[in-house]
């Protein structure tokens, strides 16, 4: 074959192979498009107290009618609205419906929403939020685990009649009414609150909304728009408007009950509720081990088009719809057993729907197998936008229970239908629906919108699950933990109660599998508890008894230290149970046995198991090696379960164990030290000394023994816990003296005197036997209680271990150093019994391991649970069986116990303002404080307490809480609902009450009430202002003084008063803004200046407005907002923008020098030149950002400064930023628009005066305007994003050219809605989206400085 022929053959082979691959890919795509979608989770709430799909099924199966009268909380005055005679204007002849029991209830704090925003929110949004959280939990998915993933949100939401006219909205709800009552926000709020990044779509096709949403979600899953879809619908009737409107049409059933497909049908009947599904591709659900409740085989939507009328149903369209859905499912009509009908109970709609079903599903059916037809609306009314998904949940439950429930209120089938035209039967009685070999059970669900949009889906029973392998028993021989957590203590109590009821009721539950589900499918929150038991009954009992639970609260997890005590922890049989129940413990003990055996003539295991031939723990040369082995083996157990030390600390002989765990000694060397040293003690010191523990400080102890020369201080264990050692007779003498003086003293049961001069007699012997040790460099930080410092070199030689035995143990000072200077918050005593835990200071968390006579798996699991309850990250997988979160055999666990408060704006009558309640009251600040130089002074503790009380009152008032007690003192205010609006309102209130000039960002700089109170108290102390408890008159005046934001501007308080401010206002009104800037620049020369960064009189610490440390760990860039030059500027400029970066990136804002308060509380110094100011900022930024790459962002004049700062960082500090974001800058040479709009600019400054424009700030603005007016020396090499406003600030003549922001250097452009000011206020999310997209691009392509 010629070469050319060979090439041709090769080419043909390659082409055939490529074609085959293309065909395979085409088949894969086709299979993907046709793949059924799995329903893996469901949640719902309906009338009659229905809170779950199980409740719904129980009600439906029992044939319950859930219609009731209008709840009083709605405030409708139904007696005035009701008129039994139809057609009278403004009245309704119906007073019944299937109302939600708690439509006003909502756990706002759980979602970080303030009470005043919750009050402004449509209850439909609130219901969707809680149901969406629950659907993840019910699917066995931790809701926190989906944050940042491509979960799509598709929800149906119709009526939006909750909010009143925004002009008469309740006080304090301004800024929340629009978003709180926009149907578009309903889906977006779910995505925002849960961090979901797939599509977020709200559908309003009236009654078909949620089923249309389901159809769109199925398409999104098949197209790859999302990997998981949350689908739902909601309906809450906030006003009687729907009753009045449909009463005028006489379209409603007078008794409020749906009589679907019945001769007695007399109109629709309203219901309320929320229904949510969670869907995945079937293959994904199986791969992830998620339980499949049912599958959606097919769906279709269409429109009636130009039919009999806008709101009239259209039979041919419904028939076409059903055929479309069956085709999508690749099924025939006879493959479907039942249809959940739309069935609204109207005399027009029901016959049309029934005829469409007869013409489609009613044809071609086998004898005796009619299509069954029912409607959930007969139980729960017409739940409008929620009704479609509600019907899906009903049919999924019917599939699971094998029963088709009956439809209520059907006297007989409607005579408006020829039922003989096909094989369709109404479910007037319940019918069994068992599984059948060779035939899958299927159901159709219909929903038709009043505007003509129709939807139909086909459901199929879940595919058979392969037999699961038997669940392996947990490592602890049946002992399992059930962890529970909540956002608040009250919610935790409720959660515990729910789980206890679950353990009581669900006798089929496997405790180990339920434990795994609790771990895998529930978010770990701050308030925690754990029940430990070896059976369902034991766990139930533990949950019922407070003393049976481990409880804790997570604050700052801080750092973890392992503590290894000296003697005194031993007890006969310690560790014996764990030898049999903990493989990790047994393996570590076996290693120790091997290491000890060359130096001892007894067996470690025999001693632990108390074998008759084994020596007892009474001998020092036995107890010390055994205690060592137990401690290091327990350390291995802690590490196996995910708790690893960031430092180790040992007490006396405990330092040997600590050294081994730290890697500073090998196991062989550690065994040598502990055995040979204890043998020397037994041979030479035993019987010659004693030790005593005193409840005294070190200094008081020293004074006590100064005349007892045979005694010395052996150890300092705590502030009032000191150990003395020495001669036995003097020990007795000291004990008697202490007893006589009422001082607690305990003689330690040892007969030798460690840490005293007695030890000097064995110095030479220890030098000999411990010669040749090979100390290592510690791999885990080792803090020496002998040296009082870190051991960082291989220094633990024989001499060290002599000194360790001879000299004082500085345990308490060591703990203080680790806690105060090194950030250690958790100290785990790794021992068979705790002896040091109770000596730890209150500011740290002390945890034990085993306890005397309680050393088995139950105690170990309890100790591990205590660690988790107090905030440590436990590896639950090491404690629990390896199984999926929820297998088909596992009953559903209780969902989160939301803590509801009532939020409801009642409808107003003619000419009235709406009433509103947040738990039925106006939140006010009830009490005040007297401030100022004339007040009766409190001591420091009293002042801090008084200030904290004031902070709590004002925070409660701003958030519209019932009382200050609802505001957690140690939780960040952002997490309980503070945002940019409430932060400013709160700051204004506190400033007015105290006379201070706190910045609007103060709640972000000092995020918790405690931290904030400390800042305020310190500032008052600096000013020498006293604080006193308020008089009755002062208590009455505080709320008036703390008027809400907007009632009085910052300028009106006097804080912004001054000659220049008044002149500036006049200049703006006269359209002489630019001229006055020159005046301010000239006058600024008379303000004191600083000429080097070191001389800057302000703290320029950047304020963390959003994000967290996770981003830095990932190497993603930190965003730094460069505050602008405006006199009202500061880090608060970025409050609204930064909200969109929460959970995305760290967002810092750095102040500009010259605008704040100097260190002596006077006016800050101005920089002598721009580079000096930039250097001061650069130092602050580099300190705050650490090793993380930095992206600078500025708006307007701040944008110009951001570029100058980038150049300065690059050239003067060798730290070029990863990028620069310039938001609407107008640099020199391109300032014509600024000159034309100078008046609008000035007016904008006064309109946005969150920070009062004092004379000092105006002069600073003038100084920086002069700095930026001239040419600058260079340009930064960092990539630049230019974000431009899309709307002019004022009138603009086209012949002037382009008014938009300009930048001469290379850059990327993003245009966003709004003008120069509103882009950073009303359209801040659009700016954030542009910035985030650009950052992702530059980090993906260029690495963004990683």
UniProtKB/Swiss-Prot annotation:
Binding positions (substrate): 1125, 1197, 1224
Activity regulation field: Irreversibly inhibited by (2S,3R,4S)-2,4-dihydroxy-3-methylhexyl-phosphonic acid and (3R,4S)-4-hydroxy-3-methyl-2-oxohexyl-phosphonic acid.
Cofactor binding, per record: Binds 1 phosphopantetheine covalently.
Limits of the Carrier domain: 945-1020
Record's compositionally biased regions (Basic and acidic residues): 1030-1041
Coiled coil: 3-32
Cofactor: pantetheine 4'-phosphate
Active-site residue list: 207 (for beta-ketoacyl synthase activity), 342 (for beta-ketoacyl synthase activity), 382 (for beta-ketoacyl synthase activity), 652 (acyl-ester intermediate), 1196 (nucleophile), 1316 (proton acceptor)
Top enzyme category: transferase
Result of altering residue 652 to A: Unable to catalyze the biosynthesis of the 14-membered ring macrolactone narbonolide, however it is able to produce the 12-membered ring macrolactone 10-deoxymethynolide
Source species, domain of life: Bacteria
Recorded metabolic or biological pathway in which this protein acts: Antibiotic biosynthesis
Region (Disordered): 1028-1050
InterPro entries in the cross-refs: AB_hydrolase_fold, Ac_transferase_dom_sf, ACP-like_sf, Acyl_transferase_dom, Acyl_Trfase/lysoPLipase, Ketoacyl_synth_AS, Ketoacyl_synth_C, Ketoacyl_synth_N
Span list, region Acyltransferase: 562-844
Record domain Ketosynthase family 3 (KS3): where: 34-461
O-(pantetheine 4'-phosphoryl)serine found at: 980
Activity-pH behavior: Optimum pH is between 8 and 8.4. In the thioesterase domain, the size of the substrate channel increases with increasing pH.
Keywords for this protein: Acyltransferase, Antibiotic biosynthesis, Coiled coil, Multifunctional enzyme, NADP, Phosphopantetheine, Phosphoprotein, Transferase
Annotated function: Involved in the biosynthesis of 12- and 14-membered ring macrolactone antibiotics such as methymycin and neomethymycin, and pikromycin and narbomycin, respectively. Component of the pikromycin PKS which catalyzes the biosynthesis of both precursors 10-deoxymethynolide (12-membered ring macrolactone) and narbonolide (14-membered ring macrolactone).
Domain remark from Swiss-Prot or TrEMBL: Cells lacking the TE domain are unable to produce methymycin, neomethymycin, narbomycin and pikromycin.
Listed name of the protein: Pikromycin polyketide synthase component PikAIV
């Amino acid at each position: 074959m010629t070469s050319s022929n060979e090439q041709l053959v090769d080419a043909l082979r390659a082409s055939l192979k490529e074609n085959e691959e293309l065909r395979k890919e085409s088949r894969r795509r086709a299979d993907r498009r046709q793949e059924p979608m799995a329903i893996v989770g469901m949640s719902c709430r309906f009338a009659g107290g229905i809170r779950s799909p199980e409740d719904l099924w129980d009600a439906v199966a029992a044939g319950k009618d859930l219609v009731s009268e209008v709840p009083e909380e709605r405030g409708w005055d139904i007696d005035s609205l009701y008129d039994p005679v139809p057609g009278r204007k403004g009245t309704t002849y119906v007073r019944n419906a299937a109302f939600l029991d708690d439509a006003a209830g909502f756990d706002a704090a759980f979602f970080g929403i303030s009470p005043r925003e919750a009050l402004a929110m449509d209850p439909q949004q609130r219901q969707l939020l809680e149901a969406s959280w629950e659907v993840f939990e019910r699917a066995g998915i931790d809701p926190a685990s989906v944050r940042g993933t491509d979960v799509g949100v598709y929800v149906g939401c119709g009526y939006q009649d909750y909010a009143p006219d925004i002009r008469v909205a309740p006080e304090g709800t301004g800024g929340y009414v629009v978003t709180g009552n926009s149907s578009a926000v309903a889906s977006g709020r779910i995505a925002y609150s849960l961090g979901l990044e797939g599509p977020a779509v709200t559908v309003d096709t009236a009654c078909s909304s949620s089923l249309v949403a389901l159809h769109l979600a199925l398409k999104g899953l098949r197209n790859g728009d999302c990997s998981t879809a949350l689908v739902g619908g909601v309906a809450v009737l906030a006003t009687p408007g729907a009753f009045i409107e449909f009463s005028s049409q006489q379209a409603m059933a007078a008794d409020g009950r749906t009589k679907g497909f019945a001769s007695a049908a007399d109109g629709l009947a309203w219901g309320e509720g929320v229904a949510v599904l969670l869907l995945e591709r079937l293959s994904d659900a199986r791969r992830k081990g998620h339980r499949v409740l049912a599958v959606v085989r097919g769906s279709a939507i269409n429109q009636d088009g130009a039919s009999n009328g806008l709101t009239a149903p259209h039979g041919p369209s419904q028939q076409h719809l059903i055929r479309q859905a069956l085709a999508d499912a690749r099924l025939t009509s006879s493959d479907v057993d039942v249809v959940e009908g739309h069935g609204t109970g109207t005399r027009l709609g029901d016959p049309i729907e029934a005829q469409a079903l007869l013409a489609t599903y009613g044809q071609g059916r086998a004898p005796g197998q009619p299509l069954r037809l029912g409607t959930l609306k007969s139980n729960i009314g017409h739940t409008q936008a929620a009704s479609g998904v509600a019907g899906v949940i009903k049919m999924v439950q019917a599939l699971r229970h094998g029963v088709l429930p009956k439809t209520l209120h059907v006297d007989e089938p409607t005579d408006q239908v020829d039922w003989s035209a096909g094989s369709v039967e109404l479910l007037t009685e319940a019918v069994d629906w068992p599984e059948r070999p060779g035939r899958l059970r299927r159901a159709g669900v219909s929903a038709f919108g009043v505007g003509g949009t129709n939807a139909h889906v086909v459901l199929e029973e879940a595919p058979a699950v392969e037999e699961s392998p038997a669940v392996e028993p947990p490592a602890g021989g049946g002992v399992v933990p059930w962890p529970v957590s909540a956002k608040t203590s009250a919610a935790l109590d409720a959660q515990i109660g729910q789980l206890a009821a679950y353990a009581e009721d669900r006798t089929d539950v496997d405790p180990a599998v339920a434990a795994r589900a609790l771990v895998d499918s529930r978010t770990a929150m701050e308030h925690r508890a754990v029940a430990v038991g070896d059976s369902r009954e034991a766990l139930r009992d533990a949950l019922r008894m407070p003393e049976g639970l481990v409880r804790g609260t997570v604050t700052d997890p801080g750092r973890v230290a392992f503590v290894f005590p000296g003697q005194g922890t031993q007890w006969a049989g310690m560790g014996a149970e764990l030898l049999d129940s903990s493989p990790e413990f047994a393996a570590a003990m076996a290693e120790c046995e091997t290491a000890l055996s060359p130096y001892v003539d007894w067996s470690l295991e025999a001693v632990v198991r108390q074998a008759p031939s084994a020596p007892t723990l009474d001998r020092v040369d036995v107890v010390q090696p055994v205690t060592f082995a137990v401690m290091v083996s327990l350390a291995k157990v802690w590490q196996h379960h995910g708790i690893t030390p960031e430092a180790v600390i040992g007490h006396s002989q405990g330092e040997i164990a600590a050294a081994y765990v730290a890697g500073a000694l090998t196991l062989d060397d550690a065994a040598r030290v502990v055995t040979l040293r204890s043998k020397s003690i037994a041979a030479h010191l035993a019987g010659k000394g004693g030790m005593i523990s005193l409840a005294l400080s070190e200094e008081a102890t020293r004074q006590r023994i100064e005349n007892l020369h045979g005694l010395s201080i052996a150890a300092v264990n705590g502030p009032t816990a000191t150990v003395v050692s020495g001669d036995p007779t003097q020990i007795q003498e000291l004990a008697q003296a202490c007893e006589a003086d009422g001082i607690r003293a305990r003689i330690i049961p040892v007969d030798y005197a460690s840490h005293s001069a007695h030890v000097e007699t064995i110095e030479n012997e220890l030098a000999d036997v411990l010669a040749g040790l090979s100390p290592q460099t510690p791999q885990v930080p080792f803090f020496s209680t002998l040296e009082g410092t870190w051991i960082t070199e291989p220094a633990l030689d024989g001499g060290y271990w002599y000194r360790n035995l001879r000299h004082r143990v500085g345990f308490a000072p060591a703990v203080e150093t680790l806690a105060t200077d090194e950030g250690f918050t958790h100290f785990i005593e790794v021992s068979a019994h705790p002896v040091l835990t109770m000596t730890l200071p209150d500011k740290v968390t002390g945890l034990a391991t085993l306890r005397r006579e309680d050393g088995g798996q139950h105690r170990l699991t309890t100790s591990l649970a205590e660690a988790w309850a107090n905030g440590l990250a436990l590896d639950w997988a090491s404690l629990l069986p390896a199984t999926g979160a929820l297998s088909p055999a596992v009953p559903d666990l209780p969902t989160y116990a939301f803590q509801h408060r009532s939020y409801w704006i009642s409808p107003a009558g003619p000419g009235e303002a709406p009433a509103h309640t947040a738990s039925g009251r106006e939140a006010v600040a009830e009490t005040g404080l007297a401030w100022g130089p004339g007040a009766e002074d409190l001591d420091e503790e009293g002042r801090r307490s008084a200030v904290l009380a004031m902070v709590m009152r004002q925070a409660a008032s701003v958030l519209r809480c019932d009382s200050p007690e609802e505001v957690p003192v140690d939780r960040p205010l952002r997490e309980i609902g503070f945002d940019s609006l409430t932060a400013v309102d709160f700051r204004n209130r506190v400033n007015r009450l105290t006379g201070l000039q706190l910045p609007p960002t103060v709640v972000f700089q000092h995020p918790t009430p405690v931290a904030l109170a400390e800042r305020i108290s310190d500032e008052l102390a600096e000013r020498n202002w006293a604080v006193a408890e308020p008089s009755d008159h002062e208590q009455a005046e505080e709320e008036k003084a703390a008027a809400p934001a907007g009632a009085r501007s910052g300028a009106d308080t006097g804080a912004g008063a001054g000659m220049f401010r008044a002149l500036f206002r006049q200049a703006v009104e006269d359209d002489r803004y630019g001229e006055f800037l020159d005046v301010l620049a000239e006058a600024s020369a008379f303000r004191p200046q600083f000429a080097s960064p070191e001389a800057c009189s302000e703290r320029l610490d950047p304020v963390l407005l959003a994000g967290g440390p996770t981003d830095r760990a990932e190497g993603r860039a930190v965003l730094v907002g460069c505050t602008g030059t405006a006199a009202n500027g500061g880090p608060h400029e970025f409050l609204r923008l930064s909200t969109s970066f929460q959970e995305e990136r760290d967002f810092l804002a750095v102040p500009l020098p010259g605008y704040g308060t100097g260190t002596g509380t006077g006016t800050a110094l101005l920089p002598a030149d721009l580079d000096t100011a930039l250097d001061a900022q650069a130092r602050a930024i580099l300190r705050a950002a650490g090793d993380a790459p930095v992206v600078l962002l500025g708006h307007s004049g701040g944008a110009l400064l951001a570029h100058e700062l980038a150049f300065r960082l690059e050239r003067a500090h060798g730290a070029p930023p990863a990028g620069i974001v310039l938001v609407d800058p107008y640099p020199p040479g391109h300032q014509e628009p600024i000159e034309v709009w100078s008046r609008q600019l000035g007016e904008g400054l006064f309109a946005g005066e969150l920070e009062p424009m004092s004379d000092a700030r105006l002069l600073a603005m003038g100084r920086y305007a002069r700095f930026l007016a001239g040419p600058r020396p260079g340009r930064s090499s960092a990539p630049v994003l230019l974000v431009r406003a899309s709307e002019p600030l004022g009138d603009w003549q086209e012949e002037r050219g382009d008014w938009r922001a300009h930048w001469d250097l290379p850059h990327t452009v993003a245009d966003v809605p709004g003008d120069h000011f509103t882009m950073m206020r009303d359209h801040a999310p659009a700016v954030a989206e542009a910035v985030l997209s650009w950052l992702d691009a530059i980090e993906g392509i260029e690495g963004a400085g990683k």
